[in-house]
A protein has these predicted regions:
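Residue-level signal for inorganic ion chemistry
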Residues: 43, 65, 240, 280, ...
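Short helix-loop capping/hinge segments that flank enzyme active sites or metal/cofactor-binding pockets
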Residues: 85-105, 267-284, 329-385, 436-447
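Short glycine/serine-rich loop segments
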Residues: 117-250, 428-451
Length: 483
């Protein structure tokens, strides 16, 4: 039976089609087995039905999506195929500017904000023939001024498709829910300190934070200029590689963009394979505590890799104030990024009480304070770099737990000792690439993730590790119980 017959009574493509990977959907579009228009219509219909139940979208861009889908369909029929994302729907986190549409940054005082231009990543995707079906919901200001609970969003708390009494994590909350529930095959997320990796882990999908400077951030809201990254959240690690190959590249309008050539990311199944057996360091000291079943799930994932040629060696993250340095860098840089909002007093309109006041405290830091933190940061980066003399990638859990209940505060704001070596803080601070992919389920039937971290600029290595695991496991094929 061809895909055009695989429909529900409402003429929407079946879940078996909508849960296909980016690569599989792209191949079917290229081969004429799937129409970009019917694919867009199906994802739009599903998004309009399930998106509100999850608080997953800030805006659904139906008119734009259908316009782009029809254009893609005509081009492909005429033999003008632009590449693996041509005619393929996606969602973009609502901190990425899309001309003519609201870009609210998830924040109540900016609910009517819009821009007259597209972010560089949107321009790249337009040139690739991709189809934007919506702006994904997010935590207000991506948590840049702090927050204490998952309801700190203009659109309300984003609910986890695996259990709507649980949260998706933040700040790329909508992007995680959208991909997990097959409202789109992939989405743009942003990550300053775990905002791609946490929703990826909690939602049971694959998500990648590229090396710092690999993807242009022009037209995306800034939190911390020296730590912000944009990256793909998708069904598989292979999907992340495909999407990253389109998003990556030098942008002269982003002063932190890597130089031409260095910033490019060529990707194919051949480049995704490691030429030598992967040397993987299993981090043994990065979480204060892990929930029951998580450590064994990660160990089982690493045994799969070991069975297929990788070497696994236990290693400790060198001691140091990684989390403090990451947090202080974000606090100081966000005080500058959101200066207008703070000085005007409009931060009082934010939903979360932490965000309402945090900016004022952050502006009390001095230039000397900032420089001292950056000196410490340079030392910590050198310590972490030494680990990659022995390993290609480092591995640990995607997060220290499965998804938290909607009414629970983020773990870092709960009572207990600070996670001084949490990998999201360490690798974000050092500008390292990382990917999280699903590796199991908790006793509550919520996803666990395993995370791979690579040396700066070696984005291929983390994809290779995740791809090797996914080629010998089925956790990425799980579907949440939502329809």
């Amino acid at each position: 039976m061809c895909e055009s017959q695989a429909r529900t009574n409402e003429s929407v493509l079946s879940e078996d089609i909508l849960y296909l990977s980016v690569r599989e959907l792209g191949e079917r579009i290229r081969g004429g087995k799937l129409s970009p228009v019917e694919l867009a219509e199906s994802f739009l219909t599903r998004s309009e039905a399930l998106g509100p139940k999850l608080n997953a979208y800030a805006t659904i861009t139906r008119e734009l999506a259908l316009q782009q889908a029809h254009a893609a369909q005509k081009e492909i029929a005429a033999g003008h195929y632009r590449g693996p994302l041509h005619g393929l729907p996606y969602a973009a986190k609502d901190l990425v500017a899309v001309a003519g549409y609201p870009t609210t940054w998830g924040a109540r005082p900016l609910a009517k904000q819009s821009f007259e231009y597209n972010a560089t990543v949107i321009e790249k995707l337009n040139r690739a023939g991709a189809v934007l079906i919506g702006k994904a919901a997010m935590i207000e200001l991506a948590g840049g001024l702090g927050y204490s609970a998952g309801d700190a969003s203009l659109t309300g708390p984003c609910k986890n498709p695996w259990n709507t009494n649980y949260w998706t994590c933040g700040s790329s909350s909508g992007s995680g829910a959208i991909v997990a529930a097959a409202l789109a095959p992939w989405a743009i997320g942003s990550d300053t300190r775990g905002s791609i990796l946490c929703p990826t882990s909690w939602c049971g999908i694959s998500g990648m934070r590229p090396s710092f400077g690999r993807v242009s951030r022009r037209g995306a809201m800034a939190i911390a200029w020296t730590m912000d990254k944009l990256g793909p959240m998708a069904r598989t690690a292979d999907d992340c590689g495909l999407v990253l190959s389109v998003l990556a590249g030098h942008d002269p309008l982003d002063f932190n963009s890597l130089p031409p050539g260095v910033s490019d990311f060529a990707y194919s199944p051949a480049t995704a394979e490691s030429a030598k057996p992967l040397r993987i360091g299993r981090l043994t000291n990065v979480w204060n505590q892990q929930v029951a079943g998580l450590e064994s799930a990660v160990d089982a994932a690493l045994k799969v890799l070991e069975k297929h040629g990788a070497t696994i060696t236990d290693v400790e993250m060198p001691d140091g104030p990684y989390e403090e340095a990451a947090e202080l860098t974000i606090l100081m840089e966000s005080a500058s990024a959101f200066d207008e909002l703070i000085v005007s007093g409009r931060c009082a309109e934010l939903i979360d009480p932490v965000g309402q006041i945090n900016g004022y405290a952050s502006q009390e830091f001095s230039v000397g304070d900032y420089l001292q933190v950056q000196r410490v940061r340079t030392f910590l980066q050198a310590q972490v770099d030494k680990l990659f003399e022995r390993f290609d990638v480092l591995a640990t859990a995607g997060e220290s737990s499965a998804a938290a209940p909607l009414n629970a505060p983020p773990e870092e704001d709960s009572a207990g000792p600070i996670e001084r070596r949490a990998p999201d803080g360490v690798s974000s601070l050092c500008g390292l690439p990382a990917i999280s992919v699903p590796c199991g389920l908790s006793k509550e039937k919520l996803p666990f993730g395993v995370q791979f971290v690579g040396r700066a600029l070696d984005d291929h290595a983390v994809i290779a590790a995740a791809r090797l695991f996914q080629s010998h496991s089925d956790w990425h094929k799980m579907r949440p119980p939502i329809s």
